[in-house]
């Protein structure tokens, strides 16, 4: 029986590997929504690092809103300056960058090194657009620490295990370092009394 929309949110939105189904048989629009949920990487706060990703986007939003109204941006009664913004921007851009680099590498190898792909047993059971979607979904799921997959992809090979491990480390642990650095920078700054027009 169908478990409804809540089942999709539990499977795709949580960042803790709690997937309970494989998604190769979903319709194209459903597959796109499943990927989008993981690529946003903060939907409903996620679990665990989802809150830290919210923190990154809040820093960016506070900085932009401060520029729009002509005030020095403040968050939690501390000034947000260029150093915090640079770190937050790098953290926000790292997630899609790692996903796209991994997908581009896999697509390049599939097209230009077919002997290597065949030596690993072949990867794609569904060539064409859906095959590209399977590769994109694999790296998206690794980067979002989700654990699901479009299982038409033969991903239990040396290449996929190593590349997905690298993507997981880069997209999970490097942002945590940046987010903790932002928290440390804000903690060192002087406390500013919160007023009605601050964004706290």
Label for each model-derived stretch:
Residues 1-9, 197-200:
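Single conserved hydrophobic/aromatic residue that forms the stacking wall/gate
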Residues 7-71, 86, 95-134, 141-148:
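Membrane-embedded translocation segments of transport machinery
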Residues 17, 76, 136, 147, ...:
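Hydrophobic, well-ordered secondary-structure elements that form the walls
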Residues 47, 89, 100, 165-174:
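Hydrophobic transmembrane alpha-helical segments of multi-pass transport and channel proteins
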Residues 67-81, 182-196:
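Alpha-helical transmembrane segments
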Residues 82-95, 199:
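Alpha-helical transmembrane segments and their helix-start/interface "positive-inside/aromatic belt" motifs
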Residues 106, 175-187:
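Membrane-helix cytosolic exit motif
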Residues 149-156:
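Extracellular/luminal re-entrant pore-loop and selectivity-filter region at the outer mouth
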């Amino acid at each position: 029986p169908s478990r409804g929309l809540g089942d999709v949110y539990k499977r795709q939105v949580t960042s803790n590997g709690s997937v309970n189904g494989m998604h190769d048989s979903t319709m194209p629009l459903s597959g796109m929504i499943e990927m989008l949920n993981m690529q946003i990487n903060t939907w409903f706060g996620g679990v665990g690092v989802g809150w830290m990703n919210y923190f990154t986007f809040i820093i960016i939003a506070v900085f932009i809103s401060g520029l729009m109204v002509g005030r020095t941006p403040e968050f939690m009664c501390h000034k947000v300056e260029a150093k915090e913004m640079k770190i937050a921007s790098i953290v926000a851009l790292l997630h899609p960058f790692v996903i796209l680099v991994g997908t581009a590498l896999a697509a390049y190898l599939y097209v230009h090194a077919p002997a290597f792909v065949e030596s690993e047993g072949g990867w794609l059971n569904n060539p064409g657009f859906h095959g590209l979607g399977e590769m994109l979904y694999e790296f998206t799921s690794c980067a979002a620490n989700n654990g699901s997959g479009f299982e038409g992809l033969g991903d239990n090979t040396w290449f996929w295990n190593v590349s997905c491990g690298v993507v997981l480390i880069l997209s999970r642990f490097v942002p945590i370092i940046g987010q903790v650095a932002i928290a440390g920078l804000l903690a060192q700054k002087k406390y500013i009394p919160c007023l009605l027009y601050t964004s706290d």
